[in-house]
């Protein structure tokens, strides 16, 4: 092989981009795991302690005390009902927190559902196995009331936006008093919006306020709303307290379509529209 070609290949190989492993993205819903089964290697492409699996290879490692339990209403031994998705949920029977380590890290956000009889917490760490700096810590207050046959019947959503890559998340609480439902890793936090007009129809020259009310799963939305009238941008307004509004008095007679689109770094984009009638 000519020396010039060898040099070319060497340079080509030298500057090949390094392929990094993709960050973890998926839903840990505990489906296919059995009643009182330890999660073990199920979400690392392996099996649970009772042989369930192989599960999806999310590169997740769980501490040895992480178990799943099925509702008694479905033939298991769990004292709960109404869990989102109807799959088994995660719990622990020892005083140590349950920690889930993501080998490839998690970006964007973590959001999950929980049910608690006593106060618990969720702490997100930069490193594996609950090490490194704390990126976020959320209190999980008791949320069950009005339950009859089952002690746990209310499930609350909690979302944690991430400004840096997370290495692990730890769930702590009183044993047998905290249950964790589906855990969403690395995906944008779902949002919804309602767009309203202060006066519709209105009179030409009358000030009309358009209000976009934005809600997000398990947390307050952070971002801005872009308002358009007849396809033209009329303002970009930051969301405060879940609300962004803009006031116009210059709309022409007739019907004008008003559009509002919410955008946030770790939130899903959502848009709504209405037709404003001016007499």
Where would I find each of the regions flagged by the language model?
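Bacterial N-terminal signal peptides
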Residues: 10-17
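Bacterial N-terminal signal peptides that target proteins for export
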Residues: 1-8
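Solvent-exposed beta-strand/loop surfaces, strongest in extracytoplasmic domains of secreted
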Residues: 188-279
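Surface-exposed, well-ordered secondary-structure segments
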Residues: 23-188
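Sec/Tat signal peptide C-region and signal peptidase I cleavage site
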Residues: 18-22
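A generic structural signal for beta-strand entry/edge sites
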Residues: 17, 97, 155, 166-168, ...
């Amino acid at each position: 092989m000519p020396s010039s070609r060898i040099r070319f290949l060497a340079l080509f190989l030298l500057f090949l981009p390094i392929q990094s492993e993709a960050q973890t993205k998926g839903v840990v819903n505990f489906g296919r795991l059995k009643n009182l089964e330890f999660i073990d290697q199920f979400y690392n492409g392996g099996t649970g302690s009772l042989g369930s699996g192989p599960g999806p290879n999310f590169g997740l490692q769980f501490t040895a005390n992480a178990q799943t339990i099925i509702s008694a209403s479905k033939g298991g031994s769990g004292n709960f009902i109404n869990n989102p998705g109807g799959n088994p949920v995660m719990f622990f029977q020892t005083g140590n927190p349950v920690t889930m380590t993501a080998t490839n890290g998690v970006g964007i956000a973590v959001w999950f559902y929980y049910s608690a009889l006593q106060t618990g917490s969720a702490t997100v760490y930069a490193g594996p196995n609950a090490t490194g700096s704390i990126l976020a810590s959320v209190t999980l207050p008791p949320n069950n009331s009005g339950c009859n046959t089952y002690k746990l019947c209310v499930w609350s959503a909690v979302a944690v936006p991430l400004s840096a890559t997370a290495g692990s998340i730890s769930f702590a609480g009183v044993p047998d008093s905290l249950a964790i439902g589906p855990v969403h890793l690395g995906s944008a936090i779902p949002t919804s919006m309602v767009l309203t007009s202060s006066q519709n129809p209105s009179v030409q020259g009358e000030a009309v306020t358009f209000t976009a009310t934005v809600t997000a799963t398990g947390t307050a939305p952070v971002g801005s709303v872009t308002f358009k009238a007849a396809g033209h941008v009329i303002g970009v307004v930051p969301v405060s307290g879940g609300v962004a509004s803009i006031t116009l008095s210059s709309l022409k007679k007739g019907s004008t379509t008003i559009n509002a689109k919410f955008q946030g770094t770790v939130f899903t984009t959502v848009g709504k529209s209405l037709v404003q009638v001016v007499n």
